[in-house]
Every structure is written in structure tokens, then in C-alpha cells.
Amino acid sequence: MMSVVVRTITRIIFPLVLVFGGYVIMHGHLTPGGGFQGGAVAASAAALLLVAFGAPRLAGHKDWLSLLEDFGALAFLALAFLGIGVTFFRNVLAASGGLFGAPVPPGPNPGLLDSGGTVPLMNWAVGLKVIAGLGSVVVLFGLFGGRDDR
């Protein structure tokens, strides 16, 4: 466990890191980034917690991370099978008029969040899987590694 200053700064920075990870995930179909990159940014928040508070404090979150990883995988597969009537992975929400289904205006990068069809939703599914996977790795490294018996 670190000093009071490190723990206080971690409490301030932790939600900002999660929000920035969500931003990278959400804008993945418009800018460089996406589910994996945003998930890695958000999972780095777990490493920040590990350094500031120690491994025992994170040990209780292994089950939540496992559930989050399962949900991300199932959400991705469900979105992939939405277009099975036409083509596997077909962007069935594009230009449908609903959520994430606005028609894409002409131009190289319109910059509209709702113009991606199923791609932003798949980015979120991948992001959840990466957050949970990398977060689990960080927690397990903290619990089982790092002992120096010299």
C-alpha cells in the first residue's frame, strides 16, 4: 500500500481513466482506437488501483471481472449473429433510423457517433472483454507475483 498522497490522487484519476477508455471505445469507428485500445486504457485503471491500494483490495473483484468478460463475449456473438439472415457480421443497424442507425452523410469522416451501425456496439463488447481480461491479468499478477525471496 502506498502513501496517502498516492491513494488520494488515484481516487481522483481512476474515474478519469475509465471515462477516457470509454471515449476511445465509443469513437473507435470514427477515429483511431476502438474496443481493444479503449479496453486497454480502461484496464490500466486496475493497475493504478493495484499500485496504490495493494493486491488484497482487488482480490474480491475476480468474479466481477469474469462475469464482465463473459458478457462481452456473448454480446459480441449476439451482435455478430444479428445479420445471419443475410450475411454473418452484416451491419444490420446501418441506415435503419434507430439507435446508431442514422444514414451516413457523404464525406470522408462525418464524425457522427450514430453513423456506425453495429460497429460501436461491437466496439463496446470487445472493450468489455479486454477490460475484464487485462484487469484479471493485473489482479492475478498482483496476487501471485512480485515476491522477491532474496
Please provide the spans of the model-predicted regions.
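Short, non-helical or kinked segments that cap or interrupt transmembrane helices
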Residues: H29-A43
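Flexible extramembrane loops and terminal tails that flank transmembrane helices
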Residues: M1-F20, V24-H27, L49-R150
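Gly/Ser/Thr-rich active-site loops/lids in small-molecule metabolic enzymes
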Residues: V41-V51
